[in-house]
Amino acid sequence: MRITQGTFSFLPDLTAAQVKAQIQYALDQNWAVSVEYTDDPHPRNTYWEMWGLPMFDLRDAAGVYGEVEACRTAHPGKYVRVNAFDSNRGWETVRLSFIVQRPEKEDGFRLDRTEGPGRTQRYALQHRSYAAG
């Protein structure tokens, strides 16, 4: 099952040219770009591992893309994403985030609902391997 997180998550994977174009767009907006990776894409896992430091002073998409490729090479079976942070007063948040690499086999999640005392509903997310069936 394909994990859907971030911008473009319902589209096919971006090509190298499309990734570079999105990075250039972020740089043109004066957003700081960073690269992160993880093996746990659970929705509550918002803190992925950073690849190096955010590139505050870099203005060239090719330089950022080089870091994306280095992260992909170092972590071939993990998720890799690009974030663009807007530090302008009033925003100060991630304005663009998209996954640029996925493992060959993506695990998914299942929502379990159980009824408790007084008809209360309890929900739990379960990690699930879809390759097992």
Curated annotation (Swiss-Prot):
SMART domains linked: RuBisCO_small (SM00961)
One of the GO BP terms on file: reductive pentose-phosphate cycle
Keyword Magnesium: no
Pfam families: RuBisCO_small (PF00101)
One MF term in the entry's GO annotations: ribulose-bisphosphate carboxylase activity
Ranges that cross the membrane: none
Record's keyword terms, sorted: Calvin cycle, Carbon dioxide fixation
Statement: the UniProt record of this protein carries the keyword Electron transport: no
Miscellaneous note of the record: The basic functional RuBisCO is composed of a large chain homodimer in a 'head-to-tail' conformation. In form I RuBisCO this homodimer is arranged in a barrel-like tetramer with the small subunits forming a tetrameric 'cap' on each end of the 'barrel'.
Subunit-level organization: Heterohexadecamer of 8 large and 8 small subunits.
Function, in words: RuBisCO catalyzes two reactions: the carboxylation of D-ribulose 1,5-bisphosphate, the primary event in carbon dioxide fixation, as well as the oxidative fragmentation of the pentose substrate. Both reactions occur simultaneously and in competition at the same active site. Although the small subunit is not catalytic it is essential for maximal activity.
Stated family: Belongs to the RuBisCO small chain family.
Name of the molecule in the record: Ribulose bisphosphate carboxylase small subunit
